Amino acid sequence: RGVYIPSDAPASDWDLVEAATRRSDATICLVSALAHHDLTDTIPDRLDVAIPRGARPPVTDAAIAWHRFDRSTFDVGRGTVSVGGTDTEIGLYSPERCIADAFRLRGLIGYETARDALKEWLRRGGRPTSLIEVAALLPRTRTPILHALEVLS
């Protein structure tokens, strides 16, 4: 059930490797994705990984939190990134999608995390129109983002 690697393999983030090998559609999301994009100061205690709703999360020994996202919006803002030290790739949501998910699931990760990520993204030159376009594709997202943008401007 484990992921087997050679003893002389280079150091890597083995939680990412395990998630990517267990499910080909695994996608880094929420706080883990915000941390990957340097949009939060929060250090995730586990890897947040999205899979399509209806898919069964694999059994792993790694510190992975599996989240089920709707199949119709699963690919919105989804790209891939290679896992350092390996030839493995894993899905990663764009900064706009990460912020939209943070507001959509603010009850799970906290409003402050979502707000701080939005502030940092805007400080770096993020365009509100691109964020609103992504938010319009996701349920329960557009209104809280519009309110936060109004307060921050």
Residue spans of the language-model regions?
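Short beta-edge/loop segments at beta->alpha junctions of small alpha/beta modules
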Residues: 1-32, 54-55, 59-61, 152-153
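Residues in well-ordered beta-strands of folded domains
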Residues: 5, 20, 50, 67, ...
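Short amphipathic alpha-helical segments and their helix-coil junctions
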Residues: 8-15, 74-86
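Exposed, interaction-prone assembly regions rather than primary DNA-binding/catalytic cores
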Residues: 35-79
